[in-house]
Regions:
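Conserved, mostly hydrophobic/aromatic
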Residues: 5, 27, 35, 52, ...
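Hydrophobic faces of well-ordered beta-strands that scaffold small-molecule active sites
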Residues: 3-7, 35-37, 59-64, 88-90, ...
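Acidic/histidine-rich catalytic cores of soluble enzymes
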Residues: 120-208
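Short, electropositive alpha-helical surface patch
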Residues: 53, 61, 65, 140-152, ...
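Alpha-helix-loop-beta-strand connector modules within alpha/beta enzyme cores
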Residues: 48-64, 111-118, 145-153, 211-214
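Glycine/small-residue-rich loop that forms an oxyanion/phosphate-binding "nest" at active or ligand-binding sites
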Residues: 71-110
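Acidic-and-aromatic substrate-binding clefts and catalytic sites of carbohydrate-active enzymes
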Residues: 11-17, 34-47, 64-73, 95-99, ...
Length: 255
């Protein structure tokens, strides 16, 4: 398995092309060889290809806006082909951070054709979870279960986010096992406690989640890319947080 950096962690430094270029260099200087492109400014596919090459990085996953996926599926795939990325991601189900029966049904209706087209063109479609997918629909089933059942494994993969699974009160390792063969990419994100009984995101190894076990289960489930993400670094420098996570994972023998 390969360690990667989810660029959403350092999105505030990639709001324009110059900043994006410098961000890629800084991430590479930490030691990362792969990235997920998400939360950055807009870019042309050829520009990204050239910037990745300059920094010695490869892009293994993206997050693409829902409208672009629905309205321009073929162009999205063509762009990914330019910068040699086979994995195309959706960051969340459209719905403003919540899900209802109606929102879920529209999601399936809108994205089943997208998933089929992406597969037809030789790419893979990935869905990134938050916590809301672990709420229950009117029939008593978890929405995450409904998603896994509605989309065949060959049409939908999952970017399992360890923090949000844990936040939802679910067992991370159990879900990695449950999605075995569909979790080529995993978002590694730690959870720490605070003195006011609130949880917060932390660099890997600086919280309380059992990442040695999570990583072991990920390997058994066929995961290829372990992508470090920290949505909020609070008072810390996001690049310093990425380095802390990188150093911890390297100490476990990962590259």
């Amino acid at each position: 398995m390969v360690i990667g950096a989810q660029l959403y962690t350092v999105r505030d430094f990639a709001k324009d092309l110059d900043g994006f270029s410098e961000t890629l260099k800084k991430v590479a200087d930490i030691g990362y060889k792969t990235v997920q492109v998400s939360g950055t400014c807009e870019y042309e596919a050829l520009w990204l290809k050239e910037e990745l090459q300059k920094s010695g990085l490869s892009c293994v996953l993206t997050h693409i806006p829902p409208a672009a996926l629905i309205e321009n599926t073929e162009k999205v795939c063509a762009d990914h082909d330019v910068f040699s990325c086979k994995n195309i991601g959706l960051g969340a189900m459209p719905g403003g951070g919540k899900v209802t029966d109606e929102i879920y049904e529209k999601f399936v209706s809108d994205f089943m054709p997208v998933a089929k087209k992406i597969d037809e063109l030789g790419f893979k479609f990935f869905y990134h979870n938050h916590a809301f997918e672990f709420s229950k629909s009117s029939d008593g089933k978890l929405f995450i279960d409904k998603i896994t059942e509605a989309f065949p494994a060959e049409l939908l993969n999952f970017t399992l986010d360890t923090f949000w699974v844990h936040f939802a009160g679910a067992d991370v390792c159990e879900w990695i096992e449950k999605l075995s063969g569909r979790v080529e990419c995993v978002h590694l994100k730690d959870m720490a406690a605070t003195f006011n009984n609130r949880n917060r995101m932390a660099p890997i190894g600086y919280g309380n989640m059992n990442f040695e076990k999570i990583i072991s289960k990920s390997e058994l489930a066929g995961s290829k890319y372990l992508l470090v993400e920290q949505d909020d670094c609070y008072e810390e420098d996001p690049f310093a947080c990425l380095k802390k996570s990188y150093d911890y994972l390297r100490a476990l023998g990962l590259e």
